[in-house]
Amino acid sequence: MAEDVRAEIVASVLEVVVNEGDQIDKGDVVVLLESMKMEIPVLAEAAGTVSKVAVSVGDVIQAGDLIAVIS
């Protein structure tokens, strides 16, 4: 079952840590966001394979936007 990784806040994408096809564990950092001059790691809530990365460095994302999909 696929697990969507979504943004919880409005932020810009500072770094994309994973690539499509990567095996990740629950708690691994998926992306680093920047909001109000703070770096905020977005963590995987499930282990699996990254099947889609929906953001790029520099993107401005809104709360609820899709960041990645873990299968």
Swiss-Prot record:
Pfam families linked: Biotin_lipoyl
Gene3D superfamilies xref list: 2.40.50.100
Origin: domain of life: Bacteria
Residue positions, PTM N6-biotinyllysine: 37
PROSITE patterns in alphabetical order: BIOTINYL_LIPOYL
Domain Biotinyl-binding: 2-71
Key words of the record: Biotin
Protein's recorded name: Biotinylated protein TB7.3
Record organism: Mycobacterium tuberculosis (strain ATCC 25618 / H37Rv)
